[in-house]
Amino acid sequence: IQRFGSIDRFAHWLMAGSFVVLAITGLNLLYGRHLLIPLFGKEAFATITTIGKFAHNYLAFAFMVGLALSFVLWARHNIPSKLDLKWLAMGGGIFKKGVHPPARKFNAGQKVIFWAVMIGGLSVSMSGIALMFPFQTSMFADTFAMLNMIGFNLPTDFTAMQEQQLNQLWHGIVSMGLMTMIIAHIYI
């Protein structure tokens, strides 16, 4: 029985493949200076990082296409249901041998991963676009202004440099969270 069609597999591997390259190149941009220069030297590091930066910036768009396509294909199958509560109560069958809790197309664990990837992927994509086009976006000022309309009291008067600093921080935190979650997804 074929569970997923060609378009489903294409969407998954477009998103997954680009994510792996984005994770490696992003980690290199963040930590490579400290880890790779002692191993390869400054010249080799500069070449690796320059190529990695271009790959990171261009493959980001492949990730966004994979993310959007995955949302269109699978969002309706990932709406939580009462059956998911039963699946969660049984621990997904991980703790008892031979126990396989009922689920529809996707179980509750897969649904959690799906929504975390959709929300985290959208968030990291938006902050990534803001980083690629500096001084042209005000993602944090705009987001904080919207939150202020529902009762928060957050600052909205950021300089362009402060916006970029917040984008870098957010991009790194969300990316690390996604990498951690995807490692767990692959392992389980």
Which residues does each predicted region cover?
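Membrane-embedded alpha-helical bundles that constitute the cytochrome b-like, heme-associated redox core
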Residues: 1-188
